[in-house]
Structures are given as C-alpha cells and as structure tokens.
C-alpha cells in the first residue's frame, strides 16, 4: 500500500470546512413533549402580551397608592379589606378610598388599585390592616406586557429547545412544534484486534470500547443510532458496510483504520463511495489522523481507534456537524477560561487536548488533568468533564496559568455549590 502524504490543518479550519458544506435536514413537526434538544425550524412570535394583565407578584393587598401617602411609623394608615382573590380569579369590586383587596401571587390587579402591599409590610386585624410607609404607583405590580409584547420574537429559528423554551412554547399554546429533523448516525468500529463486549479476552485482542462510547455520545445528543457489526481489517467488507450504512443514515462514524499502516483502509473506502475528503490530518494531539469526508449531503467521520482521540474527535468535529445539519445558530465548541491547578510540562508541537476535571465556582473555574492522559487511555475519559486546550508551539504550563477549556459536562459536586 502506498503511504499517503498528509498535510495537517488547524482545528478551527477543520471545523470550518465541516460547517461550510451544504448539508441540511428537513423540517418536521413533533409533539411538544418530544421536542427537547431539537432545533427550532421557525421563529416563535408572541401572540399576546406577557403578562396578559397587570398582576401581583406577591401575596398581599391591592390598594390605591394615593391613599398611602403620608404613612410612617408615627402615622399608620388604615385600609378596609373589601374582597379576597386568588390566582385565576378576578375581583368585581372597584377599589375606593382607603379600601383594599386581599390578593394572592399571580392574581389580576382589581380595578382602581395601582399598588400592592406585601403581607409582611402590614399589621392585620379582622377586616382591616395598617401600613407604615407610602407606596408609589405600580409598586409591587407586574405590568401587562413587561416581559414580552405581541409581535416580539420570543424564540429564534435555529435555537436549541431547552426546558425553558418548552415553557415558552407551552405558554403560547404550541402542542406541536416545527423542528429540524435530527440526523441518524451509523457507528462502525473497525479492527481485527477488536472483540465484542461479552467476548472472552484473547492474546493480542482488546474489547471494542469506542463503539459503545460513540453510541452513548450520539444518544446524549438525542440522535438515533445504528450499530454495525465490528469490522475486521478487510477492504471489500469495509466498503460494503459503509455503503449499506450510507443508505440508511445521515452520518457514518467509523473508529480505527485512519492511520497510515498497512491495514488502514479508510482512504480507499472513501474513494469507493466517491466521497470528497475534507481533511485527513489535523494539527492536534490526540487525534491528528482524524479524517472527515462528505458526499451527497452526508458526512463520513473517520475517528481514531485510540479511545481518547476518538472521544476528542467526536466532541470537536461530529458535534458541530450535527448542529450544522440542524441549522443551529451556534455550532462551534464553547471555550471558557480556567486556572490550571497542577503542572503540565509536556511540550505541545500541535494543539493538545487534555481530558480534565473542571470546577466552576463564583471565583472562576479551575482545572486538573484527569489521570493518565495518553491517546489510548480509557479511564481518564470517565473522570473528565472538560478538555483543556493547549496551543501548539507551547512548552508546557505551570500551575496557576490560565488555560482554555471546552466543557463536555457541567455538573458540580454538592460541596462546590455556593448557596
């Protein structure tokens, strides 16, 4: 086999080449309860004001502000309670001179009233109460339309539907939502050295860990995943299974077979399916031989057989492709700053991604590398919630340096919460 010369490109350029391709999924309609994590296919426009009416944000008494003027500790002013309403009810009383309506949170402000006195600001008797401070017009009132007004775009096309977006959709009566269909993914692990999870270990063999990991990463994004039988190092069978996967899926992910060894057939497979190779070497560690190809609106990802490199390739390249296909507004990985808490002295000829554990506090983020960090390492992935990104050309970093990190998880331990 002729060894192909590969020219590395920067990580950012690699992602840009992916999202520059003309690839989009169709719009579909799903039930609201099935829309979580989908991408909106259209703007959502407010069809009425929120709040729809002036309402009370507290439990208390609705009064006329003019009647409270002059109130003080030495001059308590008395009000007579003429009605009592809860959320969902509307008073038919007109609040008059030194009158009040007992009102619960969320209830509509009665006619004549223009301020709310919280219970704790009063001294109550049977059907009266007194106050010791004046209230201004609209004090303690949520005004009609103060959050959104009719015609406002409340959710944008391309926005990810999170639980908050579901609340907005429910507010405006969307029992069904127009979204972009999520791509389906085929996962194909390659390598004659691979055994299935339930196989007995043999000399020179390892269990397939990449396939289950990629499946989990894809399912975490809400994607439908097809798992294919582990492929041995055979060109003809490799071509056949990739062609089959391309007929059924929008994205095909293979793990292994992307290096330049005698048994790495992926370049030949891409030629056989007439795919355009977008890049086949990235200036990064691990995962420098990550390869991405494109044909007929579909992506083919050749991820490294090394678990950490495979994980890194999915986070950096597969995720942006999925978002791009769904028309997401934001497709690039989000980078934040963190303080490195221990030395990392290894030189970095290329951009290096280190599996790590970040801690987010009110004082900022700190990060510690997650155990053994070679490209073939597996355990470090399980204990990481981010990747540290060290720039190429650097000669190591000392504890206390500020570094860039990409969060892959964002939960915190209970003792880290500041309440």
From Swiss-Prot:
Top-tier EC class: transferase
GO biological process: Mo-molybdopterin cofactor biosynthetic process
InterPro entries: MoaB/Mog-like_dom_sf, MoaB/Mog_dom, MoeA-like, MoeA_C_domain_IV, MoeA_C_domain_IV_sf, MoeA_linker/N, MoeA_linker/N_sf
Enzyme Commission number(s) of this protein: 2.10.1.1
UniProt cross-references to PANTHER family, sorted A to Z: GEPHYRIN (PTHR10192:SF5), MOLYBDOPTERIN BIOSYNTHESIS PROTEIN (PTHR10192)
Cellular component GO terms, alphabetical: cytosol
Cofactor note text: Binds 1 Mg(2+) ion per subunit.
Pathway of action: Cofactor biosynthesis; molybdopterin biosynthesis
GO molecular function ontology, one term from the record: metal ion binding
Species name: Staphylococcus aureus (strain MSSA476)
Family stated for the protein in its record: Belongs to the MoeA family.
Protein name: Molybdopterin molybdenumtransferase
Cofactor(s) in the UniProt record: Mg(2+)
Catalytic activity: adenylyl-molybdopterin + molybdate = Mo-molybdopterin + AMP + H(+)
Family annotation (NCBIfam families): Glp_gephyrin, molyb_syn
Domain of life the protein comes from: Bacteria
Keywords: Magnesium, Metal-binding, Molybdenum, Molybdenum cofactor biosynthesis, Transferase
């Amino acid at each position: 086999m002729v060894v192909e010369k590969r020219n590395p490109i920067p990580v950012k350029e690699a992602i840009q080449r992916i999202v520059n391709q003309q690839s989009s999924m169709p719009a579909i309609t799903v039930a609201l309860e099935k829309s979580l994590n989908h991408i909106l296919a259209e703007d959502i426009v407010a069809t009425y004001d929120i709040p729809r009416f002036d309402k009370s944000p507290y439990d208390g008494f609705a009064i006329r502000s003019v009647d409270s003027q002059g109130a003080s500790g030495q001059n308590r002013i008395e009000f007579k309670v003429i009605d009592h309403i809860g959320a969902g009810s509307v008073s038919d009383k007109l609040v008059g001179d030194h009158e009040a309506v007992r009102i619960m949170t969320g209830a509509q402000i009665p006619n004549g009233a223009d301020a709310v006195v919280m219970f704790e600001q009063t001294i109550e008797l049977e059907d009266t109460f007194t106050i010791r401070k004046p209230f201004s017009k609209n004090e303690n009132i949520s005004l009609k339309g103060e959050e959104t007004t009719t015609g406002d775009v409340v959710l944008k096309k391309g926005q990810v539907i999170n639980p908050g977006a579901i609340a907005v959709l429910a507010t405006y009566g969307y029992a069904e939502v127009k979204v972009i269909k999520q791509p389906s993914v085929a996962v194909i692990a390659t390598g004659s050295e691979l055994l299935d999870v339930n196989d007995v270990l043999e000399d020179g063999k390892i269990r397939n860990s990449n396939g289950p990991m990629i499946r989990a990463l894809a399912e975490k994004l809400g994607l439908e995943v097809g798992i294919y039988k582990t492929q041995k190092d055979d060109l003809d069978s490799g071509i056949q299974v990739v062609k089959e996967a391309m007929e059924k899926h929008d994205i095909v992910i293979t793990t292994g077979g992307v290096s330049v060894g005698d048994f790495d057939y992926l370049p030949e497979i891409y030629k056989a399916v007439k795919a355009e190779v977008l890049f086949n070497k990235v200036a990064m560690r691990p995962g420098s031989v990550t390869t991405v190809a494109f044909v007929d609106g579909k992506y083919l990802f050749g991820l490294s057989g090394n678990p950490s490199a495979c994980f890194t390739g999915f986070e950096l390249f597969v995720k942006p492709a999925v978002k791009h296909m769904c028309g997401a507004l934001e497709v690039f990985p989000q980078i934040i700053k963190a303080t490195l808490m221990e030395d990392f002295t290894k030189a970095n000829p290329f951009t290096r991604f280190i599996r790590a554990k970040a801690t987010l506090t009110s004082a900022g983020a700190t990060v510690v590398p997650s155990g053994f960090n070679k490209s073939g390492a597996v355990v470090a992935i399980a204990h990481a919630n981010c990747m540290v990104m060290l720039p190429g050309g650097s000669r190591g970093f000392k504890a206390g340096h500020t570094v860039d990190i990409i969060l892959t998880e964002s939960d915190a331990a209970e003792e880290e919460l500041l309440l």
